[in-house]
């Protein structure tokens, strides 16, 4: 029982009636969650302040309609409702810009994975690894139909070939499309990047824990848009190299 309480229960998949983010697996996603919590706190403070002011105005005027008969202006209040929101916006803006530029930075990646969206599946290419034929390692990933799912597999999320990545390794994802606009979205990794035909977008990720992460195409791309799940497995480097040798 004590061991069960000591273990962390990680949420890396969408859950019914979920009200919060999936658990973070990268520094970028950790920063997004922290920024969200801070902004939500500021919004609650502002909501409480505005609610108090409205309540105060309604109760005072209800007691006496002549309460502010001789009040022409209030310099202190004018200064407060200008300075207070400005300071709050600055406290939200600075962390937001820092996180934005941090997420856009691609730091000397140890390996690159190219993801190409097609109607309606994903094609992946490991540009740093070669197969026996001398070509770069690549494979296609399709959603497993509901009637072929095995015990433990997730409906509309599991695929026949998942992406395997090593943990604690700087990864670069290069995303494009072969037909219409798609979107490569992995909530636990803090990744959401457009896959546009004729354009090669890039983003980075540093997975800090082992796990299986799920995502989906987040751009309406046709009748089978919901059939483009993404599955990434983060494994130790030794297991990753063994998986590469098997391909």
Curated annotation (Swiss-Prot):
Cu cation A2 binds at residues 217, 219, 221, 225. Its cofactor is Cu cation. Its main location: mitochondrion. Keywords: Copper, Electron transport, Magnesium, Membrane, Metal-binding, Mitochondrion, Mitochondrion inner membrane, Respiratory chain, Translocase, Transmembrane, Transmembrane helix, Transport. It is found in: Mitochondrion inner membrane. Residues 56-86 are mitochondrial matrix. Binds a dinuclear copper A center per subunit. The chain crosses the membrane at residues 39-55, 87-103. It is an enzyme of class 7 (translocase). Its EC number is 7.1.1.9. One of its GO terms (molecular function) is cytochrome-c oxidase activity. CDD domains: CcO_II_C. Disulfide bonds: none annotated. It catalyses: 4 Fe(II)-[cytochrome c] + O2 + 8 H(+)(in) = 4 Fe(III)-[cytochrome c] + 2 H2O + 4 H(+)(out). One of its GO terms (cellular component) is mitochondrial inner membrane. Residues 1-38, 104-247 are mitochondrial intermembrane. GO terms for biological process: ATP synthesis coupled electron transport. Mg(2+) binds at residue 219. Component of the cytochrome c oxidase (complex IV, CIV), a multisubunit enzyme composed of a catalytic core of 3 subunits and several supernumerary subunits. The complex exists as a monomer or a dimer and forms supercomplexes (SCs) in the inner mitochondrial membrane with ubiquinol-cytochrome c oxidoreductase (cytochrome b-c1 complex, complex III, CIII). Belongs to the cytochrome c oxidase subunit 2 family. Component of the cytochrome c oxidase, the last enzyme in the mitochondrial electron transport chain which drives oxidative phosphorylation. The respiratory chain contains 3 multisubunit complexes succinate dehydrogenase (complex II, CII), ubiquinol-cytochrome c oxidoreductase (cytochrome b-c1 complex, complex III, CIII) and cytochrome c oxidase (complex IV, CIV), that cooperate to transfer electrons derived from NADH and succinate to molecular oxygen, creating an electrochemical gradient over the inner membrane that drives transmembrane transport and the ATP synthase. This is Cytochrome c oxidase subunit 2. It comes from Eeniella nana (Yeast). The gene is COX2.
């Amino acid at each position: 029982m004590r061991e069960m309480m000591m273990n962390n229960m990680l949420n890396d998949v969408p859950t019914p009636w979920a009200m919060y983010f999936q658990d973070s697996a990268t520094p970028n996603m950790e920063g997004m969650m922290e920024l969200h919590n801070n902004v939500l706190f500021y919004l609650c403070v502002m909501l409480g302040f505005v609610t108090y002011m409205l309540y105060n105005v309604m109760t005072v005027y209800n007691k006496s309609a002549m309460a502010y008969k001789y009040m022409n202006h209030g310099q202190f209040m004018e200064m407060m409702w200008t300075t207070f929101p400005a300071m709050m916006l600055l406290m939200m803006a600075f962390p937001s810009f820092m996180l934005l530029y941090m997420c856009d930075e691609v730091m000397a990646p140890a390996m690159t994975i190219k993801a190409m969206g097609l109607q309606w599946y994903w094609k992946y290419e490991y540009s740093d690894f070669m197969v026996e034929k001398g070509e770069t390692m690549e494979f296609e990933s399709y959603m497993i139909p509901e009637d072929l799912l095995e015990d433990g597999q997730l409906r509309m999320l599991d695929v026949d070939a998942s992406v395997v990545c090593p943990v604690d390794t700087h990864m670069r994802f290069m995303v494009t499309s072969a037909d219409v606009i798609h979107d490569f979205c992995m909530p636990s990794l803090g990744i959401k990047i457009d896959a546009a035909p004729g354009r090669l977008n890039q983003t980075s990720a540093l997975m800090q824990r082992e796990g299986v992460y799920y995502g989906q195409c987040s751009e309406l791309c046709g009748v089978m848009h919901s059939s483009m799940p993404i599955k990434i497995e983060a494994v130790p480097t030794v297991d990753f190299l063994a998986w590469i040798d098997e391909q």
